Amino acid sequence: MVNVVLALLSGFLFFAGFAPWEIWIAPYVAIVLLFRILCDKALPERFTYSLLAGLAFFLPLLHWSSVYVGSIPWLVLAVGESLLFAAIGLVRWQRRWENALLFSVIFTAIELLRMKFPFGGFGWGRLGFTQVDSLNWLYPWIGVTGISLLVSTSAFLLISKSKTIVVILSIIAATFLLSKILSPDTQGKILQVTAIQGGVDELGLGFNDRAMRVLERHVQATTKIERTDLYVWPENASDVDPLKNEKARLLITDLVRRLESALLVGAVERTLEGPANTSLLFGADGEVESRYVKQDLAPFGEYMPVRRIAESISPYAKQVNDFVPGDKWVRHSINGNPFQSLICFEILDDDHVKDGTKGTTFVVAQTNNATFGRSSEAAQQLQITRARAAESAREFVVVSTTGFTSHLDAEGKVLAKAPQFTAESLTMKVKLVDPRHETPAQQLSTWFWALILGLLSGSAWWRISR
């Protein structure tokens, strides 16, 4: 019974590292506690304790997925993630440093697996998202996956030889000094950007039931700000296709001509193949200068895998239209400065984010959080976005229909944040980075980390078998 309680405590401590708690030290304690519980146990016990820890972690973490659609989708998602998490219990563990090293490696590998599998993956709840306030200077060097490995290595350090601890701490200290010396070139350029959080009439799945209402709210919330170079609207700000609907097009073109500035619009287009989630840059003359189509679609939100099964589980599955994904990155540009839009779910996959942030001077994260009500989803998503800003060493303009609309600096710190659930405009001075600048983390793919994890696990297995 004691181990059952400790397993549940371990899972809750993992959860405590994420919003709304964001206690960065909690995952360190959780990983050590989980390792100690699993040591010297039989397979049934290991798997049971791992599963209990996973449930205590993912059930509260993903509770936002039950808002408006009921408990069944939430339970299916949380249990599915917990089963993948519980794979850590399939290996026999002992209180030896080689086992602890292997534990941290396999734990990180399971996180990468969750990021990619199934249905393209769901990387929510990775330890690498929890350390922005404690290790933000390290993100540009090793990225989210590297941070996950570092946190999970706590179990390794606990029983490691003192010399090993000294070596690892020395490497971390050297990296900290390098991060201060080799900071990215900001070019000395500043771009004034105004993010518009127009809000919705009603939170929930029917936030856009009244045609054009969300668009009208964003038009009304957009007022002319002196010297603003770019206005940005969130995902789904135009709930009707502004390229096909004449009234919607006129509302936007009249607005940008009055503003005398460019406007980035999150819109839902209607194509012959199906709806497309797009980011449209309207120039000051009212013409569309660039168009990016979201590539990494959210399973069960923007398309429905195993539709027949999903519809038998939840009636809301029938309301999901299958969106058409884009097939390439399209850089927007303002005053000759390239930037990229990442749309909502696109911030989750390491490789996708790294490809998207390369060659940019800053990044816009467009999202719509109206469908998750007053849950912690928006705060958790902002935490993830902060990690991405630190990883790419680029400032982020985060714009949401209902919040949190924010300005993040290149270290992932929140410089400004609009309150939730109100119509707000947030004007920020964005420091631009040389688009040629790439952090070391931006050059490390999932395949690289798979190789590193493979080498580390092979080394640990060799030491164990001796």
Where are these regions (language model features)?
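Membrane-embedded alpha-helical bundles of multi-pass enzymes
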Residues: 1-181, 223, 374, 385-388, ...
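Soluble catalytic domains of enzymes that build or remodel membrane lipids, polysaccharides, and related
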Residues: 182-444
